Amino acid sequence: MLLQLLQADLAAGLLAFSFGGTHGGATVSSVGPTAPVGHNGAMALIVQKYGGTSVADAERLRAVAEHIAFTHRQGNQLIVVVSAMGKETDHLIALANEVSRTQPGRELDMLLTAGERKSMALLCMALADLGIEAVSLTGSQAGIITDTTHGKARILEVKGDRIRDALAAGTVCVVAGFQGVSTAKEITTLGRGGSDTTAVALAAALGADTCEIYTDVTGVFSADPRIVPTARKLHRVSFEEMLEMASAGGRVLALRSVEFARNHNVPLHVRSSFTWEPGTWVTSEEPGMEDPVISGVTHDISEAKVTVTNVPDRPGISAALFEPLADANVIVDMIVQNTSKDGTTDISFTVPKADMSTAERIVAEVAKEIGAGGVDHDDNIAKVSLVGAGMKTSPGIAAKMFRVLADEDVNIEMISTSTIRISCVVAASDMQRAVRALHTAFGLDSGSMYSAPLPERR
């Protein structure tokens, strides 16, 4: 059934984008039954990434295999990156917690990478059943070289020799996302969202014509449709806007994958695994186009606030506080320092809740060393943000945002800005009300309820 849906949509002439091998300007063409054309008239090299919901069970794996088979039969070279099936990673983490309170990073990475190896092997079996020659490769086998940080490794290099050889032989390469091998020859994981980063890194290293990110939504929306049912789908978003959305809590794309795509100018197409309508293109900003003032409202409930009170106000104190956090790979987001009074000040900042125990331990030690008054934390917060490339040339956005929140009786605890984003920390209990009010106030409601039912599967 899914194959018929895809063929029908293609025959109807859905729009696709063809990009040059250097990821240059995009041209729009009507897609028919012929193969998409890559750079220099050759067959296209496409990287497709399928998330956990897309490969959650045997039925969905077979559906993904049909999609891959159809795309491959159109003459395309394909690299497919897969996540672990469904909640497999969460299950493995829970299992580790049952077994041990102390989990060495090396062993945890060895455990967690098993999820992607399972899904890649099963997908290759499903492809073989359709007559498609495919080979599964772990991150190590695919040549993804990382630093030595377990759990949050960063990609240093993609060799990709085995992938090139397989593609030259007409084979579909199915690569395990989320993982690589360190310079010390140890298995590493890239952290949450690492499969997105794997896909973009492969696309950049191998000169892919495009990178398709398949997920459980039909694209990037102006807000989370679960909170704002009238959120509208964005047909195009710039790398800069997507970076701000991802850093402000948008869950469609992982932040590091967008950074990689922007740095290497890899065009991304975010679309649903369950419907065949066009999704959202994430590309470099097009000259001559007037940007919308506000593209979206995002929220993030994954952070906690730490406040260090009565900090001595003298040079070097901030460095003494934040350098140990950086050394421990704790990402600090928003930072606010109060005006000095009586030679002391308060410093508040936000960190991921997942890093809270590490941050608390480090900050408590530093607070004693520098003679601060104490350390407080609050994990019942949410970050609500406005994002829009047109914001930098439109005055009054911050004032309007603050007025809307005030009218909703939402108290603002912290504020941070960039040229195209304004973020406010509010109480977690106020988050949904704040998002809905801002979405309406800035004219983002589509007027129709979001609905994306799964297609019938046979």
Where is each model-derived feature located?
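Cationic, low-complexity basic patches in intrinsically disordered or flexible, solvent-exposed regions
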Residues: 5
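Short, positively charged and aromatic/hydrophobic N-terminal segments
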Residues: 18, 23, 27-39
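Nucleotide/pyrophosphate-binding catalytic subdomain
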Residues: 33-258, 425-427, 442, 446, ...
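Terminal amphipathic helices with adjacent charged low-complexity linkers/tails
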Residues: 82-89, 270-286, 349
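Acidic-aromatic/histidine active-site loop/patch
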Residues: 261
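A conserved regulatory-domain signal marking ACT and ACT-like small-molecule sensing domains
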Residues: 278-458
